[in-house]
Amino acid sequence: MFLGIDVGGANTKIATSDGSLVDSIYAPLWHDRAILYDVLRRVYTRLEDTGIDIEGVGVVMTGELCDCFRTRREGVLKIRDIVSTIFEGMDVEVVYFDRRGIFRHGEAIEEDPLAFASTNWLASAKLVSMMHRDVIVVDCGSTTTDVIPIVGGEIKAKRSDIERLHSHAHELLYSGVLRTNVAALLRKVKLRGEEYATSSELFAITADAYLVLGDITRADYKCESPNSYAFATEREAKSRESAMRRLARMLCCDLEEIGEEGAHSIAVQVKDAQVNELITALREMRERYSLNEVISAGIGDFIVKDAVKALDMKLLTPSWDRRLSAVLPAYAVAKLLEIEIANDNAGSAGSNDC
């Protein structure tokens, strides 16, 4: 069995290649990058306590972009150092997935750290490409949405974030269903037939909108609310009423001034904005590559479903369940490592037979 680790800036996700161990742990590196030590140490202890026998560890990351690091290069190297420090006592091989889709040892990172930056989406795409030759992979997560075209089994997406963010690429949408500032999606909202500009303050996030709409539960709200410091308990901070109050504040007012109906309307407009953004990306992919089938992953699958339906495209049923969907890059890198080791062993056996 193999372990996959996806180190993000906000969440660290883990999964075993058989899917028996799956978790997403909120670990905001920008608060203190040492938090990654604590998270991975708990993972290590959990593996020991449960007696799970790990043959190897595969790692992908996006956390290097966190502004607790001066540069992304520094971030990649620091994340590697932390992972290596924690797992060196397990006596298993730890390898890192690079932009070419190749597993390499930690020492190789010294040569070109950026070759290992933001590779989590690529692991997911590579695994899917082994099962589907012509498809668009959409992974809508807490912070971003990856839109990855696969044509004839070849991953057509650009390899760097800046290239995928290009206005003509539509491959990286920097919005997700939990952590995105509502002001980044809506510059104006409509209420009671009138149009209002929104405040650019961090008053509300997409998690608030989807909690109000019922698309996520309090348990799904795995990040801090914008005003978490104002509440005695997390339960209070992440109640539906608190979420509506934060949405109302986007218009510099209290909930009493716009009512629940007004807050609900803002939430609907947040969802419409995200769905429409994805519709634009999917339409571009369909026209550019003649693709009409979509595989969805991530906690924001409800956004993907609405966009696919609006375009009358076909949403395929993935081979993984909802638990694995939420941590797909971690599962993918574990599965890819398992496949690679199995192929290597088969090759060695074949050579011995000869």
Predicted regions and their residues:
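Conserved Rossmann-like nucleotide-cofactor binding loop
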Residues: A10, T143
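Nucleotide/phosphate-binding catalytic cleft detector across ATP-hydrolyzing
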Residues: M1-G9, A15, L21-V138, I148-C354
